[in-house]
Amino acid sequence: MASTADGDVGETLGQMRGLWPGVEDLSLNKLATSLGASEQALRLIFSIFLGYPLALFYRHYLFYKDSYLIHLFHAFSGLSIAYFNFGHQFYHSLLCVVLQFLILRLMGRTITAVFTTLCFQMAYLLAGYYYTATGDYDIKWTMPHCVLTLKLIGLSIDYYDGGKDRNSLSSEQQKYAILGVPSLLEVAGFSYFYGAFLVGPQFSMNHYMKLVKGQLTDVPGKMPNSTIPALKRLSLGLVYLVGYTLLSPHITEDYLLTEDYDTRPFWFRCMYMLIWGKFVLYKYVTCWLVTEGVCILSGLGFNGFEENGTVKWDACANMKVWLFETTPRFTGTIASFNINTNAWVARYIFKRLKFLGNKELSQGLSLLFLALWHGLHSGYLICFQMEFLIVIVEKQATNLIRDSPALSSLASITALQPFYYLVQQTIHWLFMGYSMTAFCLFTWDKWLKVYRSIYFLGHVFFLSLLFTLPYVYKAMVPRKEKLKKRE
């Protein structure tokens, strides 16, 4: 799902929904006022788009230059962005980066270093959430720090894997394992890379080092032909930005808390939640598409070639836009949304819990980690609890339809496919909106008020299915189908 960083950026875009008039005084404060945004919001938006000229500078003046120059450029530009947005509070990220380097050097490739990193970085982030918490989204230093926290935890695990026997590692772990010893400058450049410092995406140290060495290009020895792919993602991001800016005054989460919403018919309350649930995610889509374009332009988005020779620029993709817009399944939305963060959790949390021997338990603990990483508000826990519940029920329903001859035949009727799709999408986005209500309102008094107004529909619906579908499965699936499945 979305992160705290994503929520802060989303609030930024929500604030920037004025008529965009021209201004004569270009001071940040007056410009922000004329745009209907806060100065802090304008600084953030400016910083995200600043990645494009920085990437162009890197391409034309630093590509294939000495590694230390590239690390210095990335570290200095990222620190400058941090200072520009958060003033002296940029020291929080700098402190964690330096201490992380010391942990790697002093503790080495040990499990102790991994646990120390996990405990320290998460504790620092959660303490930041606690001491800066308010009832609303604020643009503060914890926004990029949650992105940095995952980077540094992943760095420690990859460094630990680099000291293990290669044969004991999976192919994925071998790909990310760090064989060398990172210098402080390398860790700083990796941490402060301008295209991902504020809102992501996540990427590994090994991938970053390939960028520094000039290996992330479709034309060896030359700059990558990534300008057009980068502009395509930027253009798509701008389309979402314009759409969100125009519609955001009319579709707000604040309306969910109004008396007018409470007095509307039940069907209206559900339909508003459905539309809002789809629309609210567009603010995250916008930011990820824009930052993906920065990563592509610099070369970091290079991901090799297809079998037919087509270049892939999706190494830093956080969105699969077509899948996101068309999938009728909750798991489809999860697979298309915040891809790199989800991949990070799968790689470093979910798969590392394999020793538990229970996939559902591993999934539940992974989602609990995600909820805590987002923040200390109860709404995050409720949102990811709903995701866990919905995914289990969706899997039950899929198995039932697949294994039941009657339901399988009914589902395969071509003439009814549009109707099925409409029903699926309605259920899908209604309960995505239901889950996002807790995520976006995040304090218990707010999300509880909205859930009461629709009678806890999401919990009632999915908990009922969770307990009844196994009995329906027993009744509708012949014994031979069950035996075949076991085989």
Curated annotation (Swiss-Prot):
The active site is at N338, H374. The chain crosses the membrane at residues 44-64, 67-87, 111-131, 178-198, 236-256, 285-305, 364-384, 422-442, 453-473. It comes from the Eukaryota. Its EC number is 2.3.1.-, 2.3.1.23, 2.3.1.n7, 2.3.1.n6. Disulfide bonds: none annotated. It is found in: Endoplasmic reticulum membrane. It is an enzyme of class 2 (transferase). GO terms for biological process: chylomicron assembly; endoplasmic reticulum membrane organization; intestinal stem cell homeostasis; lipid modification; negative regulation of inflammatory response; negative regulation of response to endoplasmic reticulum stress; phosphatidylcholine acyl-chain remodeling; phosphatidylcholine biosynthetic process. Keywords: Acetylation, Acyltransferase, Endoplasmic reticulum, Glycoprotein, Lipid biosynthesis, Lipid metabolism, Membrane, Phospholipid biosynthesis, Phospholipid metabolism, Transferase, Transmembrane, Transmembrane helix. A motif (Di-lysine motif) lies at residues 484-487. It catalyses: a 1-acyl-sn-glycero-3-phosphocholine + an acyl-CoA = a 1,2-diacyl-sn-glycero-3-phosphocholine + CoA; a 1-acyl-sn-glycero-3-phosphoethanolamine + an acyl-CoA = a 1,2-diacyl-sn-glycero-3-phosphoethanolamine + CoA; a 1-acyl-sn-glycero-3-phospho-L-serine + an acyl-CoA = a 1,2-diacyl-sn-glycero-3-phospho-L-serine + CoA; (9Z,12Z)-octadecadienoyl-CoA + a 1-acyl-sn-glycero-3-phosphocholine = 1-acyl-2-(9Z,12Z)-octadecadienoyl-sn-glycero-3-phosphocholine + CoA. GO terms for cellular component: endoplasmic reticulum membrane; membrane. Pathway: Lipid metabolism; phospholipid metabolism. The modification N-acetylalanine is found at A2. InterPro entries: LPLAT_7/PORCN-like (IPR049941), MBOAT_fam (IPR004299). GO terms for molecular function: 1-acylglycerophosphocholine O-acyltransferase activity; 1-acylglycerophosphoethanolamine O-acyltransferase activity; 1-acylglycerophosphoserine O-acyltransferase activity; lysophospholipid acyltransferase activity. Glycans are attached at N308. It is a multi-pass membrane protein. PANTHER family: LYSOPHOSPHOLIPID ACYLTRANSFERASE 5 (PTHR13906:SF14), PORCUPINE (PTHR13906). Belongs to the membrane-bound acyltransferase family. Lysophospholipid O-acyltransferase (LPLAT) that catalyzes the reacylation step of the phospholipid remodeling process also known as the Lands cycle. Catalyzes transfer of the fatty acyl chain from fatty acyl-CoA to 1-acyl lysophospholipid to form various classes of phospholipids. Converts 1-acyl lysophosphatidylcholine (LPC) into phosphatidylcholine (PC) (LPCAT activity), 1-acyl lysophosphatidylserine (LPS) into phosphatidylserine (PS) (LPSAT activity) and 1-acyl lysophosphatidylethanolamine (LPE) into phosphatidylethanolamine (PE) (LPEAT activity). The di-lysine motif confers endoplasmic reticulum localization. This is Lysophospholipid acyltransferase 5. The lineage of its organism: Eukaryota, Metazoa, Chordata, Craniata, Vertebrata. The gene is Lpcat3.
